[in-house]
Amino acid sequence: MAYSYTERKRIRKNFGSRDSVLEIPYLLQMQKDAYTAFLQADVHPKKRTAEGLQAAFEAAFPIISHNGFVEMKYLEYNLAKPAFDVRECQTRGLTFASAVRAKVQLFIYDRESSTSQNKVIKEVKEQEVYMGEVPLMTTKGSFIINGTERVIVSQLHRSPGVFFEHDKGKTHSSGKLLFSARIIPYRGSWLDFEFDPKDFLYFRVDRRRKMPVTILLKAIGLNHESILANFFVNDNFRLMDSGAQMEFVAERLRGEVARFDITDKSGKVIVAKEKRVTARHTRELEQSGTTHISVPEDFLLGRVVARNIVDTDTGEILAKANEELTEALIKKLRLAGVQDLPCIYTNELDQGAYISQTLRSDETVDEFAARVAIYRMMRPGEPPTEDAVQALFQRLFYNPDTYDLSRVGRMKFNAKMGRPESTGPMVLTNEDILAVVKILVDLRNGRGDVDDIDHLGNRRVRCVGELAENQYRTGLARIEKAVKERLGQAEQEPLMPHDLINSKPISAALKEFFGASQLSQFMDQTNPLSEITHKRRVSALGPGGLTRERAGFEVRDVHVTHYGRVCPIETPEGPNIGLINSLALYARLNDYGFIETPYRRVVDGKVTMEIDYLSAIEEGKFVIAQANAVLDKDGKLTGEMISAREAGETIFAGPERVQYMDVSPAQIVSVAASLVPFLEHDDANRALMGANMSRQAVPILRPEKPMVGTGIERVAAIDSGTVVTATRGGMVDYVDATRVVIRVNDDEAQAGEVGVDIYNLIKYQRSNQNTNIHQRPIVKKGDMLAKGDVIADGASTDLGELALGQNMLIGFMTWNGYNFEDSILISERVVADDRYTSIHIEELVVMARDTKLGCEEITRDIPNLSEQQLNRLDESGIIYVGAEVQPGDTLVGKVTPKGETTLTPEEKLLRAIFGEKASDVKDTSLRVDQGSQGTVIDVQVFTREGIVRDRRAQQIIDDELKRFRLDLNDQLRLVEADSFDRIEKLLVGKVANGGPQKLAKGTTIDKAYLTSVEKHHWFDIRPAEDDVAAQLESIKNSMEQTRHSFDLAFEEKRKKLTQGDELPAGVLKMVKVYLAVKRHLQPGDKMAGRHGNKGVVSKIVPVEDMPFMADGTPCDIVLNPLGVPSRMNIGQVLEVHLGWAAKGIGQRIGDMLQAEAKVAELRKFLDELYNGTGRKEDLAQLSDDEVLEMAGNLTSGVPFATPVFDGASEADIGAMLKLAYPEDAIRQKGLTPARTQAYLYDGRTGDPFERPTTIGYMHYLKLHHLVDDKMHARSTGPYSLVTQQPLGGKAQFGGQRFGEMEVWALEAYGAAYTLQEMLTVKSDDVQGRTKVYESIVKGEHSIEAGMPESFNVLVKEIRSLGIDIELERG
């Protein structure tokens, strides 16, 4: 395998026993593919498929006027280039979007010469019409909406189609199963069928009033006879003078108890009365040639007639279909000479008379009456005219405009009906409705199975593209209505398409969806992992989905079909548990939106490299072996029985039965869970916490790679988009802290493209969670890079690998109760070395508005401000970048006009003379909040169009232009250097006809001549060969074109920066100040490992007091050993052991480098390390210099990868510990023979502890729950308007509620005065509060409690109920 640029610097030793069969797919594929398909921006308009925007337009158009003589047709749409790029949209608070312009044609037909079949065109108008702005997805799979980064979460909803279920016996007290069916379309009315406890079958539309199902069957054109014929088989009777004969059908008799003697045709009794008919009896009857059995008269009573029986002579209907036979009716039939009497066959077991009894309860007579009944149910109170009745019924299920089953729905429907084809009409057909009722009746009869609604074959994912398309369709539907109304005017008035179409409904629908929908979420940007996880999230909530309150246990639980599709571990704790899930590592979506997972195909027991993606429905048909099944060297499954899965059950199967095999053991978990090493040794609940808390890790100042990882770290870092990767290979030409310039390889540079890539790095950018996004280059000038190599590290990455925390030396021991209840004891050295220091960036905004009293002004001229405070503000009144500020400091000076008090003429005169301004404005400057401090790192000034910019705003624009010009100059320099190289190659050795420095005709050009001539004069050389001259001219034109394009780009940038900014209504100027705050680790901060082992820092101990080893190394963190056994997360112990080995091996490599060991010796040691156990590495690829550089990077600890479910065994860890700590190291460090524990010494006394302690290195994280953000205190502050009680919460600068239980505590102690103080002057006694202030000022300490305001509120509420209540003084 070839190593990337960063892998060559540091290879992660992998303990996986199985080589990767399938690369982990791009982790943001689902989001990106879905939105690309929605926009189809790069597809030629004529080649676009009917999905996304194209489908929405095709569904809405053509629009035809009410009279049919004007028609608007859609041709194609185009997406404009966005006005601002992502970064500009973020700073300006805009939406990163592209304008959609649709080309439409307006056809006006000639009224006189047109017929309904053949319309004559009178006029055609074509125009491009603006159809709103569609937000664009960034390269990282997010959206910028109003300047903030948002993610559209995919929704897991019930797939359209037909579902059969029962109520699990919960409805009726007898526990009887009531079966039901539901046809769910993508768009349109739901159709439900359900049995009631009495076995009548009903239907309902959109959960309205239920009606007998036979009404619907009649409404679709069936009559009584055809209904019975569809659901029942017939028992044919032949009427005799006395009794009758029944046609003999063996399987109907078998198992029945004979109600009379059954005889064969010879009269011999085969089955005696009251005996059960067996297979032997029916065989005897068949052998005797019996075709009819004689039955007594009473056997016919209660039977149901299968069809209308008509008197052939008179045409009179003697018995109607579904009529029960009575003695009188049989007599009447005999008299009329009827012989053949078909009756429906029913029995108690598997052929119930449900449809027949439902039909009897139905009073409608024919198709129209049935449709009228449906109309009355849908539109109660409206008169049912014939047209209205027929139109409503058609619109319910048969009109494509109002009913859409969708491709998925039709596929699912046909599959359930057992039809071979997966396509068909997108509306319901009569056959569909009939087929559903038949299956439902079969279910009630005990044939077939109900559906499992939690099966992933019945739930599909709606992605960004589909959700956005639905919103766009909504907007277009509103436009369609409006256009239809106005199309009639286009005949009389000369209107163009843009006069008819108003794009506001589309813009409003999209804005509402992207800005306020439950599925459009503020991106979790705490660290790269939280970004990736947020984009891979699948939610069952949201519009059209479930609600938290109504979701039961079943829908939240792990289902067998989640295997390889949805992670069984990662889900939030709390009310959303199980409703919000994460996509598994290898999962993808198929065309229908169902989640698929990959499997290797197995043929005759041999595992092939062919990979098939199976959905949950398909998976149930196969036998699938696990990824850890043992294979021989030829890839054949070994062993007689292999653990496999079939139809959701775990079985043991022979190798020949196995059809597929998992691709990887990590296939079942998500990205976050697959980053937990030794996951297989952790309890599921703790693994869930570990995966969730990894997403809350704060990016640290100096990220450090985890010594014990899983091998997914690199993929996660690259796919998250946090690191910068090379889009094309090439050589690094220039590097500094803010940008990297790469000269692209000749073979990768396309003709006409600039052969230079410039990567501007992000510096101190604020994330959504106020953490710091910062990129650092890791390449050097002259390095050769391939496409995809990491150029710069981002937040929480180290050499292109995810690094969320720090590797800490952990000791598992108790320490004076400071690690009681999961508290964490930390060494002062950790804080001193800035190991957990993080930078947080706050954005503070101030706006100058146009008020009724005049304009607010941002200025340095602020009343009553000390010179010391003003020193930090520039002449525009804005603080300098780099200033360190404390709470209360002024950041931006702003004054607001005060209401003018009426002035005397003398005062007006004095004011006019002396220009005294300060008295009529008040200071409303932006100041630093209480509890925050930091350094100003950036200032942005935005000015409305038409308002003069101040000097600070102009300076910011100039700096930005300077930076941009620098980039262009770099590009130009490299392009020109490249061009001159090509010219030199072209001209050297060629004959010239003349040139600069009086070059003689016929002279051969050499390098010395070219060096002596200035490069720009090379174009003046006149080569003798015409093709060489032409090439020279072409290079010259190309260079001039590049220069011109750069000048245009610079002008465009200048125009963008100098034009006025879009600001909210009434705002003249806006200033944003960014504060960077350094947060050191302190007691109260929450920390956690990756195994759900969380805790709060209790004490920071001086390094000299920490427990230390025999060689003097002190522990960094001391954890409570009681946190391990009951929590059952043993993974942390194994991680500590392997981390201990990693550190020891690193130290050994460091010692070898210090002793200047030979490269061969280093290679030998590295070979023993990397190729002793686990996956083999090809170290021969690395040059000697690369080996030395890599060894240097390994000295702080060798990175290990222990993939989930395929990780390091105890033996592997033991082998690594042996390699790390030879015998002399054991003595030196005071280790036990197993090398897993050490004898520690008490730092305060120097005495050894009695027993050895487990020590080692663990990757420990600092979480985003920082004590600085939670700490809060209030003296006085805002009060609630009604109750006059202090507000609550830190954001409102609120107080602590002294609640009911606290009152009880004071009552229990009898502390009456303290209690009175709490409930009155310290809460809502307004007069009392004022008096307390006065007494404090006077130096007295007495309180005078009055009436609490909340009591007055209570009195007012009682009065509002009409109860007169008066207070009397006691």
Swiss-Prot record:
Keywords: DNA-directed RNA polymerase, Nucleotidyltransferase, Transcription, Transferase. CDD domains: RNA_pol_B_RPB2. InterPro entries: DNA-dir_RNA_pol_bsu_ext_1_sf, DNA-dir_RNA_pol_bsu_external_1, DNA-dir_RNA_pol_su2, DNA-dir_RNAP_su2_dom, DNA-dir_RNAP_su2_hyb_sf, RNA_pol_bsu_bac, RNA_pol_bsu_CS, RNA_pol_bsu_protrusion. One of its GO terms (cellular component) is DNA-directed RNA polymerase complex. GO terms for molecular function: DNA binding; DNA-directed RNA polymerase activity; ribonucleoside binding. PROSITE patterns: RNA_POL_BETA (PS01166). Its EC number is 2.7.7.6. It catalyses: RNA(n) + a ribonucleoside 5'-triphosphate = RNA(n+1) + diphosphate. GO terms for biological process: DNA-templated transcription. Belongs to the RNA polymerase beta chain family. DNA-dependent RNA polymerase catalyzes the transcription of DNA into RNA using the four ribonucleoside triphosphates as substrates. The RNAP catalytic core consists of 2 alpha, 1 beta, 1 beta' and 1 omega subunit. When a sigma factor is associated with the core the holoenzyme is formed, which can initiate transcription. This is DNA-directed RNA polymerase subunit beta. It comes from Albidiferax ferrireducens (strain ATCC BAA-621 / DSM 15236 / T118) (Rhodoferax ferrireducens).
